[in-house]
Regions:
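A short glycine-rich, His/Asp/Glu-containing loop-to-beta-strand
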Residues: 23-58, 64
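Short acidic-glycine-tyrosine-enriched beta hairpin
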Residues: 81-97
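Short glycine/serine/proline-enriched coil/turn segments at secondary-structure junctions
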Residues: 59-60, 102-103
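Structural motif
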Residues: 46, 55, 67, 74-76, ...
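A cytosolic small-molecule/anion-sensing beta-strand core signal
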Residues: 43, 71-72, 88-89, 107
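Double-stranded beta-helix
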Residues: 10, 14-27, 40, 106-139
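Actinobacteria-biased recognition of intrinsically disordered, low-complexity terminal regions
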Residues: 1-10
Length: 139
């Protein structure tokens, strides 16, 4: 196995993009809230799923855009410099690089995230909820 962004590092595994992935089922099976897992990779981007509830930390990604796709539930994205956006099932929103944001889920939400492989979970902010890329790969 190669260590390119389109294949998992040695000793880790995620879904083969050539095989269908049920994103909602993969997210629902996650044991922990706010702990995304990589399910596929394409063109240097990771496709991640997560199960979330409550408020996440304020953070930004200085060099990367981040796309949120709600699979089940309703997710609010709070911003410091613009009105909040609320997403329902099947809706997505791309948070531009450098924009501070905070995802909020009043009830459990299943979501998919699309972002460059190098994107750090909470940007430069480190909390007990921060997951490394290796952890997101299941290492």
């Amino acid at each position: 196995m190669s260590d390119s962004p389109d294949s998992p590092p040695n000793g880790t595994a995620f879904a083969n993009p050539a095989v269908p992935v049920d994103l909602a089922a993969a997210a629902a099976a996650l044991p922990d809230m706010w702990a995304p897992r990589v399910v596929a990779a394409v063109n240097g981007q990771y496709v991640k799923v997560a199960r979330v509830q409550g408020e996440f930390v304020w953070h930004d990604h200085a060099a990367e855009d981040e796309l949120f796709l709600v699979l089940r539930g309703r997710l609010r994205l709070d911003f410091e410099d613009r009105p909040a956006v609320t997403l329902g099932p099947g809706e997505c929103y791309a948070v531009p690089r450098g924009v501070r944001h905070r995802p909020v889920a009043e009830a459990e939400v299943l979501l998919a995230l699309f972002e460059p492989a190098a994107t750090r979970h909470t940007g430069d902010v480190v909390t007990d909820r921060t997951r490394t890329v290796a952890e997101q790969l299941g290492a």
